[in-house]
Amino acid sequence: MAAGTQAIDWGMAETLAYASLVESGHPVRISGEDSGRGTFAHRHAVLHDQNRERWDQGSYVPLRHLSDTQADFLVIDSILNEEAVLAYEYGYACSSPNELVIWEAQFGDFANGAQ
């Protein structure tokens, strides 16, 4: 995609959009049950070393390493408790009006009360 041999897909377009925001000084915060990989495994925002010795090591977030002057990019894999997480993220967004705060609903065949 970067070389121009393939069309830009949704995941790449989303990554470019987030990169442009954090490079412009606008923090981005995404939360949801599968936010790191994306609900359809399209995002790859958090990369994991499959050979790590501890569960709390071996994760890398490329969008946190664009430049020394960029804004923060935070991805949170939350618990499956939509109402509580959405309420928290709404409050967070209200107190941080200059930050892009996204709550990503989990996709599935179940009723999601927060939606």
Would you name each region that the model predicts?
Residues M1-Q115:
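Flexible, glycine-rich loop/tail regions that form catalytic "lids" or insertion modules at the edges
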